[in-house]
């Protein structure tokens, strides 16, 4: 299994269990999320509750909750929405922090192509949800989510050069 970590914070943000499609010259990975139901598991252990006097759930509050699989799996933390000005400020800080962490050709490609990726994201800002990794580290990678027209499940966008592949 491959896990993709944020180069800045080390937070796990994605794995190969979630296939991605490269867009914007490979600068952005697009991943389809899914709403799933978590909790409310009814376990039958073979006991006869009526014979044992335990017909009621005793103090168990096991509610079913709908979550987005990627957000739940990687414990992504949702951030407040932003306008274009705040978004540009945050993305510039991230680019400044990420660039020295990239090596040689990867760094050059990043410098040449990141502007196109930002221009791709900018018109979507009002429709995006913003997430960061579990540690909520300053200037770490942001994960963006939005709903394509007519979709009921969110699509996630990752800045690909900011991810480090780790074998588990």
Swiss-Prot record:
<dbReference type="InterPro" id="IPR018103">
    <property type="entry name" value="Translation_control_tumour_CS"/>
</dbReference>
<dbReference type="Pfam" id="PF00838">
    <property type="entry name" value="TCTP"/>
</dbReference>
<protein>
    <recommendedName>
        <fullName>Translationally-controlled tumor protein homolog</fullName>
    </recommendedName>
</protein>
<dbReference type="InterPro" id="IPR011057">
    <property type="entry name" value="Mss4-like_sf"/>
</dbReference>
<feature type="domain" description="TCTP">
    <location>
        <begin position="1"/>
        <end position="168"/>
    </location>
</feature>
<comment type="function">
    <text>Involved in calcium binding and microtubule stabilization.</text>
</comment>
<dbReference type="GO" id="GO:0005737">
    <property type="term" value="C:cytoplasm"/>
</dbReference>
<keyword id="KW-0963">Cytoplasm</keyword>
<dbReference type="GO" id="GO:0005509">
    <property type="term" value="F:calcium ion binding"/>
</dbReference>
<dbReference type="InterPro" id="IPR011323">
    <property type="entry name" value="Mss4/transl-control_tumour"/>
</dbReference>
<dbReference type="InterPro" id="IPR018105">
    <property type="entry name" value="Translational_control_tumour_p"/>
</dbReference>
<comment type="similarity">
    <text>Belongs to the TCTP family.</text>
</comment>
<dbReference type="InterPro" id="IPR034737">
    <property type="entry name" value="TCTP"/>
</dbReference>
<keyword id="KW-0106">Calcium</keyword>
């Amino acid at each position: 299994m491959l896990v993709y970590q944020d180069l800045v914070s080390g937070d796990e943000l994605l794995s190969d269990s979630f296939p991605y499609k490269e867009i914007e010259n490979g600068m952005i990975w697009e991943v389809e999320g899914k709403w799933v139901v978590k909790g409310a598991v009814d376990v039958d252990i073979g006991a006869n509750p009526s014979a044992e006097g335990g017909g009621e759930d005793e103090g168990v509050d096991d509610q079913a909750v709908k979550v987005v699989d990627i957000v739940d799996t990687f414990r992504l933390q949702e951030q407040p929405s932003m306008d274009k000005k705040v978004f540009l400020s945050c993305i510039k800080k991230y680019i400044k922090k990420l660039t020295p962490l990239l090596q040689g050709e990867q760094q050059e490609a990043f410098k040449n192509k990141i502007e196109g990726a930002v221009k791709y994201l900018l018109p979507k800002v009002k429709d995006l949800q913003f997430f960061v990794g579990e540690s909520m580290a300053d200037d770490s990678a942001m994960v963006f989510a939005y709903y394509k027209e007519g979709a009921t499940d969110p699509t996630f966008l990752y800045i690909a050069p900011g991810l480090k592949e780790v074998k588990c």
